Structure formats: structure tokens, C-alpha cells
């Protein structure tokens, strides 16, 4: 079975480093819950678009390089691959982040079969690649996936908890995600 997985806030846990860099840059502590109230940083802490751009220009690469993987992510993906899953990373990250991203994935031994960069419409990408499931966090991507009929596992963050659909489930633990996908794979074989 083919599955798709996002990187930021799904494989890569940017929360701790993001919190520290926001404090360093803006001189004020914001909780992770506050930072993730909205998908865009500027909407969560009420800064201008220009301030947000400057923040990401200064710290974006560092956050992408130095953040740790989500707990149990590597083990869960390895287990899924051992059980016949084909793992495709689908990310909105531009190609100019390819070197950093590839290096981070290798450093943390994240198992996957294919990676696709610069994807704006993840639902369409999943349909084109015949991928029935995707693990995602961004609400706009989740909506696009659901519109295309792609079953979606959402890593729960305040910015996506309002979404509800028969093809959507919120799961916060990679071990539970792996278990759920294995159950779905067995269901697909029986159908």
C-alpha cells in the first residue's frame, strides 16, 4: 500500500526550536499552543507579513536543519516499510531546500521510498500517484486532500482541529498512526 507523509510538523518536530527562535527574535515567550493557534506565525502572534518573512529568512534553515524528528516517527515508518508500505514524502518545501531536507532525512535515518518537492495541491499529487492515505497537518492541505477523496490522518494542532470529515482522523502518535494504517491495509485486502 502506498502512503504519503508531510515533513514539517509531521516527520520533523519544529515546535521546540520554533519556540526558542521566536523568543530570541521577538524578545517574548510564546507557548507552543499560542504559536500553533493558526497555521501562519503572523496570525498566531500578530506580527506583520514582513516581520514573518524576516523571521523565516533568519531562522528557517536552522529550524529545518536542527529540529528533531517526531517521537517514534522513524520506528513507525520503518515498521510500515517492513510490512509492505511504499512511503512517499510529499512536501511544499521548494527545491532550494532539497539539500538541507535530504541531509536531515539521512542524518535521522528516516525511511522512505520517494520524495516530491514544491507540491501546492497535495490531493491532486496523491491521486496522480495513486496514494489512498496521507499524513498531514496543514488545514488547507487537509481540505485539498479530502476534496480529492484522499483519506487523511491529521497530526492534531490547534490550527486543524476544527476539521471534520468521514475520511479524516486526528492521531497524535506515530505508533497509533502505524497501527491504524496497518488496519486499513488489511481492510483494503479484504475489500
Q: Where does each model-flagged region fall?
A:
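Asp-based, Mg2+/Mn2+-dependent phosphohydrolase catalytic module
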Residues: 139-191
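Active-site neighborhood of HAD-like aspartate-dependent phosphohydrolases
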Residues: 1-52
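A short, structured active-site edge motif that brings together acidic residues
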Residues: 90-94, 106-124
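Conserved acidic residues
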Residues: 1, 113, 132
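Conserved Lys-Pro-Asp/Glu-containing loop-to-beta segment of HAD-superfamily phosphomonoesterases
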Residues: 122-145
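Short, acidic loop-to-helix structural element flanking the phosphoryl-transfer center
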Residues: 61-89, 95-101
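Anion (oxyanion) recognition and catalysis
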Residues: 81, 106, 146
